[in-house]
């Protein structure tokens, strides 16, 4: 009986292992999120001072880097010095045509007031917004932060990542890759 039970367990284990090996791979990279291809140019929200900001802001640059973050999020806080450095670099290099926008993830103590205080205390100067339903439909799909979307001047989301950037070089390479790709695409049309 013990031998039969052992053989039966071995067969079940082998069948389970084969089903795992032959399973179809997931269609998406786990670091990528849905939303690529969506047009977000119709958002209408406010900045942390209550001033209205619309999707027209996307017209200000060929590439807009939008980062979804919260004050309590460790990975968000870790990547912010890198974002600030890139914001300063691209602000002083207007021909690069890149802008940075933050969108706060409200809740768990992160409010417009606490976000504004955090940004000011740390010298972070890029535009930060509250999420409206349009931005939330892209950024709040997984419940994870930080998230980053790359948006073209036309308002179309080109990329959507979850997780933070761990170095300035990693962030610069990511931005340059997308900037180059969007420049090539613009020149082809």
What are these regions (language model features)?
Residues 62-64, 69-72, 107, 144:
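Short pre-active-site segment immediately N-terminal to redox-active cysteine/selenocysteine motifs
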């Amino acid at each position: 009986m013990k031998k039969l039970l052992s053989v039966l367990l071995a067969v079940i284990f082998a069948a389970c292992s084969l089903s795992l090996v032959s399973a179809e791979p997931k269609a998406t990279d786990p670091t990528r999120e849905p939303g690529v291809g969506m047009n977000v140019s119709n958002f209408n929200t406010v900045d942390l001072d209550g001033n209205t900001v619309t999707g027209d802001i996307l017209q200000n640059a060929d590439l807009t880097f939008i980062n979804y973050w919260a004050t309590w999020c460790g990975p968000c806080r870790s990547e912010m010095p890198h974002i600030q450095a890139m914001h300063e670099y691209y602000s002083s290099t207007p021909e690069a045509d890149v802008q940075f926008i933050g969108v706060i993830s409200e809740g768990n103590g992160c409010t417009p007031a606490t976000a504004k205080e955090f940004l000011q205390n740390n010298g972070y100067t890029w535009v930060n917004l509250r999420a409206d339903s349009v931005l939330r439909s892209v950024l709040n799909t997984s419940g994870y932060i930080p998230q980053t979307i790359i948006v073209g001047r036309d308002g179309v989301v080109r990329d959507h990542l979850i997780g933070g950037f761990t170095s300035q070089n990693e962030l610069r390479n990511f931005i340059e890759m997308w900037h180059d790709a969007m420049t090539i695409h613009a020149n082809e049309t």
